Amino acid sequence: MSTTIPRFMVAAPSSGSGKTVVTCALLRALARRGLACAAFKCGPDYIDPLFHRRVVGARSGNLDGFFTDAPTLRALLARGAAGADVAVLEGAMGFYDGMAPGVADASSYQVARDTETPVVLVVNGRGASLSLAAVIRGIAEFLPCANVRGVVLNKTSAAACAYAAPAIEKHTGVAVLGNIPADGAFSLESRHLGLVTADEVEQLSARIDKMAELVEKSVDVDRLLEIAATAPDICEEPYRLEPIAGARPIVAVARDEAFSFYYEENLRALEDLGCELAFFSPLCDSELPRGTSALYLGGGYPELHVRQLSENAPMREAVRRAVESGIPTVAECGGFLYLQREISDSEGRRWPVVGALEGASENGGRLSHFGYVELTSQRDGLYGPRGTRIRAHEFHYWQSTCPGGDFWAQKPRRDKGWPCMTTTPSLVAGFPHVYYPANPDVARAFASAAASFAERRRHG
């Protein structure tokens, strides 16, 4: 079976080139044409997909060459884009930049190559003309199968684009699809795109409407769709895990303004395995969902909402009792900090939180242990026996006095590692974010523990 998925990737020579803005504007422009859009972010970033979903209104997921192999990438693409008229992949960093200097592993290029997705470059055209051809040709020809098919000149007037386009197309063979003017309306000031309240969503959505109008006027969207239609069919079956036998356990998933960083593929994996997801708010709810058989506390910004979290004593107590009763619990990054005794806010004030784990956290002042890690368990636990290997990602500013030591985290391709995380037969908690399609046995272990807990309670 093969799946036809018209698609293209928005990529760039470097970070800060305008990929996210152009991606969001194109998604809105395509949606306004009546097209059903699916969005993907290349790499482990969970903030841009959240922005795609909450502000642009497109379903979105991740495609990551470190986490998964090429067939799995294609299977995830097939599932995430099922029923869509077009899929838009947003690149990360520079097109060839990956997990380490000197290699293109885990880069946007790798995702484009392995999924055979046509690439549209966003290139800053200000103050250059023929030199742009050198940049574009260099990217298009640097490694094989780059599949660069189009370019949009950012921060460039229509006149400058028309002047530069013939030379670019002559020397590169890449179609110039149009320009984005140097317009203050065509920007998103905050790179912390996950920090959007309900009111901000409405305001940002209105701005993206204006961006979409600009794109329709200055970019050849019809030609872009023609390029998307040249993408080969995906031969892999859509990604799906087989359900486990037994009860249909309820997994309570924390989701509100404080906890929102989840890979959509993780939630789908748990549902595939037979779990029922019940979302709750540690900020606003007073108790866990009825029948909860497992807890999933994801990342987010608990430090920005710690006063409200701390003042919600009934929920803190409900979570503490659940964890101490042995309910299977996964707590990642912000969820991990919530389980500890205290969190300091941005002004250094300490607030008591759940207290199921020792430790307190505060702002470390900089990113710590940022990037991909390969985890190896040092003891038996919820995710598997000692020696279980897991691929994950870290991104956090807050530091804990008790980060745990039940796993060893190793930076890939680097001689750097550290102890991290806490695990027991019913708990795994720490800073790393785990991507279940990279580690399906880990997802099965969590779902199986939830099902066993539900069975014991049913017969207990």
For every predicted segment, state its role.
Residues 129-243:
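Internal gly/pro-rich beta-alpha loop/helix module
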Residues 9, 88-90, 120, 152, ...:
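Structural motif
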